[in-house]
Curated annotation (Swiss-Prot):
PANTHER family: POLYRIBONUCLEOTIDE NUCLEOTIDYLTRANSFERASE (PTHR11252), POLYRIBONUCLEOTIDE NUCLEOTIDYLTRANSFERASE 1, MITOCHONDRIAL (PTHR11252:SF0). GO terms for molecular function: 3'-5'-RNA exonuclease activity; magnesium ion binding; polyribonucleotide nucleotidyltransferase activity; RNA binding. SUPFAM superfamilies: Eukaryotic type KH-domain (KH-domain type I) (SSF54791), Nucleic acid-binding proteins (SSF50249), Polynucleotide phosphorylase/guanosine pentaphosphate synthase (PNPase/GPSI), domain 3 (SSF46915), Ribonuclease PH domain 2-like (SSF55666), Ribosomal protein S5 domain 2-like (SSF54211). Involved in mRNA degradation. Catalyzes the phosphorolysis of single-stranded polyribonucleotides processively in the 3'- to 5'-direction. The lineage of its organism: Bacteria, Pseudomonadati, Campylobacterota, Epsilonproteobacteria, Campylobacterales. This is Polyribonucleotide nucleotidyltransferase. Keywords: Cytoplasm, Magnesium, Metal-binding, Nucleotidyltransferase, RNA-binding, Transferase. InterPro entries: ExoRNase_PH_dom1 (IPR001247), ExoRNase_PH_dom2 (IPR015847), ExoRNase_PH_dom2_sf (IPR036345), KH_dom (IPR004087), KH_dom_type_1 (IPR004088), KH_dom_type_1_sf (IPR036612), NA-bd_OB-fold (IPR012340), PNPase (IPR012162).
């Protein structure tokens, strides 16, 4: 067993090698303070034949890591929680670009949290543990990567803040990369205000992150290189294509290839290339269909990149900074509290907004928080197969859908003034040709306004792309699906005119230089300005239907009266909710009653509750201590019997009082009883 200690900045990381999980290709135990993560890499020795990278990353939290038993009916960890899925994606998106293009060995990276101190950053720790384990596995010539988080407190940037400091921050910036460049970014603004970060400040934060990553990666490579396994996979030359077939495609079928490139819809484009491949296969039997399809893909990609780099023209004839045409419609769904249909080119998002009560908030349990937390602002993103012309079933929420919804949520969260409101936005992607998550942000911002939610400002989103060839590169605004597939970068940026509220950057290269990222940030600001102008024009035309929006009425009663509103087994409150068609939240310690629904019904509900409590008080006032009554047994319970009293109301005859007189009662019996006390609005009885 070997121990390696890395001191970088304000962190001391410890790595125990060959201690546990020794049958894995490589494994280690990572420690940062009281946080322990078991990281392992397992590789199959037989490559797959399909043309994709068979990489799976799983980040797993164990409740015992924080000294907890899982909540819910089943007391064991079940399906992955949102935080686990999002962290798995974070690690996957960092590591995937580092693999050689022709790597085909099934590889699984597992991160298991065994112990956790909530002051430590689990995502940074997990990514660093994964990076170290992958570097030690030496399954391919993969560079060392690391991660850091940047916060901003009192206008000062802080590297790898504690959880306490992050709670005070106006910025949450997660960056990962190699010694040379950055290859993954996640950012969101934090706080009660919008806290959009200006582009020059964002560059400053990224420079600070890159400096930290450069130092950490250098330390990792120096420390871990002596312990690497023997290299499993040497990077080859890739697939060698037939030059004669390539020439044939360029000379005889080039016009048809261009037609396919210019087809805007994914399904239409795929059909064009299938027809071309079939046509060539029939005319030239010496080439296999697979060979033809690979060559077609090569010619298509080369031509798209040439058009963009040299001609400065995109496949759909747009200029590099041109945003697709935008249209916005509102109030399409009369029963929802808001609905916005945002269309940008062939990407269309229908965002529906619904307001709720405290008990509508989503409750989460994870290791990052001591107690369950309530998610009051929810953004759910759905990507049905028909939006890209596919005929397949709609299943469970995918990792991608969860990630896109989380990005849109982060973009809009700080724009909401009242953070106590419970809001659910749902984005239904009805048509997709790139940038659907950013269309969701635009529609979502307008849906908040249309729901009557007070916002600091509208927020717009745009996806930026890049095509790079040697020393030349071109930045693209509002990328289409084809440009995303054939380009080198997907950089989603959301914000207002002043700055950025959220962003997410992924790359297919080993990394992106800072000057390129800054160019993309400035170009995105120009695109955002154009989109926000259209959104503000649409906002002026939105008619908020306040009569349809739910109204909230809050009032207080004596805390001991809350149980009366609930009633035996919840009977009273159920009847009230069904009768008036409202939602009710009750706070027993404070006596607060919150009613939400149609304004007229809310007021009638409040009146009913107050009158009901008053009538109970009046019933109590009719009786005196030691008064003897003739009562009727209403219902029998485990702890006694509830009796219907002659002047109205009911009282409780406890079981012990019945037992001492050896009385056996049944419902409907009449019995003489005596009032012995009043307690919290209840009448206690004894046998007379």
């Amino acid at each position: 067993m070997d121990f390696i200690t890395i001191n970088s900045g304000n962190r001391t990381e410890e790595f125990a090698l060959k201690q546990v999980a020794k049958q894995a290709t490589s494994s280690l135990m990572y420690r940062l303070g009281k946080t322990l993560i078991l990281a392992s890499v397992c590789v199959e020795r037989e490559p797959v034949s399909e043309d994709f990278l068979p990489l799976v990353v799983q980040f797993l939290e164990k409740s015992y890591a924080a000294g907890k038993i899982p909540g819910g009916f089943v007391k064991r960890e079940g399906r992955a929680q949102d935080f686990e899925i999002l962290t798995s994606r974070l690690i996957d998106r960092t590591l995937r670009p580092l693999f050689p293009k022709d790597y085909r060995y099934p590889t699984q990276i597992t991160l298991m949290v065994l112990n956790h101190d909530i002051e430590n950053d689990l995502q940074v720790s997990a990514l660093n543990a994964a990076s170290a384990t992958l570097f030690l596995a030496h399954i391919a010539p993969i560079k060392s990567v690391s991660a850091c988080r940047i916060a901003r407190v009192d206008n000062e940037f802080i590297i790898n803040p504690s959880a306490s400091l992050l709670n005070q921050s106006s910025l949450d910036l997660f960056v990962s990369g190699t010694k040379e460049s950055l290859n993954m970014i996640e950012m969101r603004s934090l706080g009660q205000k919008l806290n959009a970060l200006e582009e020059p400040l964002m560059l400053e934060a990224l420079e600070l992150a890159q400096k930290s990553l450069k130092e950490t990666c250098a330390l990792y490579e120096e420390a871990f290189t002596p312990y690497q396994n023997e290299l499993l996979f040497k990077e080859g030359e890739g697939i060698v294509l037939n030059e004669r077939l390539l020439d044939l495609l360029k000379n005889q079928y080039f016009d048809e290839i261009i037609k396919g490139i210019e087809s805007s819809a994914l399904s239409e484009r795929e059909n064009v290339f299938k027809e071309v491949a079939k046509k060539i296969s029939e005319a030239h039997s010496e080439f296999s269909l697979e060979e033809i399809e690979l060559s077609l893909e090569k010619v298509k990609k080369t031509e798209i990149r040439r058009m963009i780099i040299q001609d400065k023209i995109r496949p759909d004839k747009r200029a590099l900074e041109e945003v697709r045409p935008i249209s916005i419609e509102s109030n399409l769904l009369p029963m929802a509290h808001s609905s916005i249909l945002f269309t940008r080119g062939q990407t269309q998002s229908l965002v529906v907004g619904v307001l709720g009560m405290d008990n509508d908030a989503q409750t989460h349990e994870n290791l990052e928080h001591k107690a369950p937390i309530k998610e009051r602002f929810m953004f759910h993103y759905n990507f049905p197969p028909f939006c890209v012309g596919e005929a397949s079933s709609i299943g469970a929420t995918s990792r991608r859908e969860l990630g896109h919804g989380n990005l849109a949520k982060r973009a809009l969260e700080t724009s909401i003034k009242n953070k106590e409101q419970v809001i659910r936005l749902v984005s239904e992607i009805l048509e997709s040709n790139g940038s659907s998550s950013m269309a969701s942000v635009c529609a979502g911002s307008l849906a908040l306004y249309a729901s009557g939610v007070e916002i600091h400002d509208l927020v717009a989103g745009v996806a930026m792309g890049m095509v790079s060839e040697r020393q030349d590169h071109a930045i693209l605004s509002d990328i289409s699906g084809l440009e995303d597939a054939e380009g080198d970068m997907d950089f989603k940026i959301a914000g207002n005119l002043e700055g950025i509220t959220a962003m997410q950057m992924d790359t297919k290269m080993s990394g992106i230089q800072l000057e390129v990222l800054y160019q993309a940030l400035l170009q995105a600001k120009r695109a955002r300005k154009h989109i926000l102008k259209i959104m503000h024009e649409a906002k002026e035309k939105i008619v908020i239907n306040f009569s349809h929006l739910p109204q909230t009425e809050i009032f207080n009663v004596a805390p001991d009266k809350i149980i009366e509103i609930i009633g035996q087994g919840g009977r009273v409150i159920k009847e009230i909710v069904e009768k008036f068609e409202v939602k009710i939240d009750l706070n027993t310690p404070s006596g607060e009653v919150k009613i939400m629904g149609n304004k007229e019904r809310v007021l009638k509900t409040k009146e009913f509750i107050l009158n009901y409590l008053h009538s109970l008080d009046q019933e109590l006032e009719q009786y005196a201590i030691d008064e003897v009554l003739e009562a009727q047994v209403k219902r029998i319970v485990d702890f006694g019997a509830f009796l219907s009293l002659p002047k109205g109301g009911e009282g409780l005859l406890r079981k012990q009082n019945m037992d001492k007189c050896q009385v056996i009662l049944k419902e409907g019996d009449s019995i003489r009883c005596r009032v012995i006390s009043f307690n919290k609005g209840k009448i206690a009885l004894d046998l007379a």
